[in-house]
Protein backbone atom coordinates (compact mmCIF):
# COMPACT_ATOMS: atom_id res chain seq x y z
CA UNK A 1 0.00 0.00 0.00
CA UNK A 2 2.66 2.63 0.88
CA UNK A 3 4.44 2.03 -2.43
CA UNK A 4 1.19 2.56 -4.36
CA UNK A 5 0.53 5.73 -2.37
CA UNK A 6 4.02 7.02 -3.26
CA UNK A 7 3.40 6.32 -6.93
CA UNK A 8 0.04 8.07 -6.81
CA UNK A 9 1.61 11.08 -5.07
CA UNK A 10 4.34 11.27 -7.71
CA UNK A 11 1.74 11.08 -10.48
CA UNK A 12 -0.37 13.78 -8.85
CA UNK A 13 2.66 16.06 -8.41
CA UNK A 14 3.78 15.58 -12.01
CA UNK A 15 0.23 16.21 -13.24
CA UNK A 16 -0.06 19.42 -11.23
CA UNK A 17 3.35 20.70 -12.31
CA UNK A 18 2.70 19.64 -15.90
CA UNK A 19 -0.63 21.45 -16.06
CA UNK A 20 1.00 24.52 -14.49
CA UNK A 21 4.06 24.61 -16.78
CA UNK A 22 2.46 23.43 -20.03
CA UNK A 23 0.35 26.53 -20.76
CA UNK A 24 3.25 28.88 -19.97
CA UNK A 25 5.60 26.93 -22.25
CA UNK A 26 3.32 26.20 -25.22
CA UNK A 27 0.55 28.81 -25.15
CA UNK A 28 2.49 31.90 -24.05
CA UNK A 29 1.68 33.51 -27.40
CA UNK A 30 -1.87 32.19 -27.49
CA UNK A 31 -2.43 33.34 -23.93
CA UNK A 32 -1.31 36.87 -24.80
CA UNK A 33 -3.61 36.93 -27.84
CA UNK A 34 -6.64 35.85 -25.83
CA UNK A 35 -5.99 38.46 -23.11
CA UNK A 36 -5.50 41.14 -25.78
CA UNK A 37 -8.78 40.10 -27.38
CA UNK A 38 -10.54 40.30 -24.02
CA UNK A 39 -9.21 43.80 -23.31
CA UNK A 40 -10.17 45.08 -26.76
CA UNK A 41 -13.64 43.58 -26.38
CA UNK A 42 -14.01 45.28 -22.98
CA UNK A 43 -12.70 48.56 -24.44
CA UNK A 44 -15.20 48.49 -27.32
CA UNK A 45 -18.24 47.35 -25.34
CA UNK A 46 -19.23 50.83 -23.99
CA UNK A 47 -19.26 52.27 -27.54
CA UNK A 48 -21.42 49.38 -28.73
CA UNK A 49 -23.82 50.00 -25.82
CA UNK A 50 -24.08 53.72 -26.59
CA UNK A 51 -24.71 52.93 -30.28
CA UNK A 52 -27.50 50.56 -29.30
CA UNK A 53 -29.05 53.22 -27.04
CA UNK A 54 -28.89 55.76 -29.90
CA UNK A 55 -30.60 53.29 -32.23
CA UNK A 56 -33.31 52.59 -29.65
CA UNK A 57 -34.00 56.24 -28.81
Swiss-Prot record:
Changing residue 41 to A: Retains 10% of wild-type activity. GO terms for biological process: establishment of competence for transformation; sporulation resulting in formation of a cellular spore. Changing residue 34 to A: Small decrease in activity. Contains a predicted signal peptide cleavage site in the N-terminal region, however the propeptide is probably only subject to processing events at the ends of the mature peptide. Residues 1-34, 41-57 form a propeptide. Keywords: Competence, Cytoplasm, Secreted, Sporulation. Residues 26-57 are annotated as: Disordered. Changing residue 44 to A: Decrease in activity. Induction: Part of the rapH-phrH operon, which is transcribed from the SigA-driven rapH promoter. phrH is also transcribed from a putative SigA-driven promoter embedded within the rapH gene sequence. GO terms for cellular component: cytoplasm; extracellular region. It is found in: Secreted; Cytoplasm. Disruption phenotype: Decreases expression from the aprE promoter. Signaling molecule involved the regulation of both sporulation and competence. Secreted during production, but the mature peptide acts intracellularly, indicating that it needs to be imported into the cell to function. Acts by inhibiting RapH activity. Can inhibit both RapH activities, the dephosphorylation of Spo0F and the sequestration of ComA. Belongs to the Phr family. This is Phosphatase RapH inhibitor. The lineage of its organism: Bacteria, Bacillati, Bacillota, Bacilli, Bacillales. The gene is phrH.
